[in-house]
Amino acid sequence: DLLAVQSAINEGELSLDELREKFFNEFCKFDKFLTNYFVNRQQRLQRDSLRLSMSGSNWRFPWQADLANAVMLTPQPRRISWWWEAQGNVGKSYMARYLALHCDAVVVTAMKKADMLHLLTKTLSGARCVIFDLTRTTEDGSVSVVYEVLEQLSNGFICSGKYDSTSLFLQPLHLI
């Protein structure tokens, strides 16, 4: 019974392996769906916990307050905000995580263009902004991929040919 599996997952007392043991027949038929449901529930709980631990706006740096305020405004079409520092430990990755948890941001790291576009087509629904959180050591080739994807996002239309090919029309987003 799928409702019994859902209930057991929502109770959160059993591991995924224990759920598979207890609901063997259901997992035989719907393993991918039930595993995704379990993982999504775990992620929701993790996000809620992180959101609580990162609540408040005690910014270490003035630019963080400026950025937090900027993403609450209406996005400007084709505007890309670039935040860069030669040194580390100035709060950029922290800010990316904060915006993902509190302001409906999607955070993207360096990866192949096809993977990046696939990720975006799966996660942009309801997003207010897209943040590219790149390390200082990110290779130039990876950065040029980010430029290409930023161009598509700023045009309001992205295409992904990976797996289940799709294209999306987008409202203006904050691009950071």
What are these regions (language model features)?
Residues 2-131, 135, 140, 169:
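P-loop NTPase catalytic core of nucleic-acid-dependent motor ATPases
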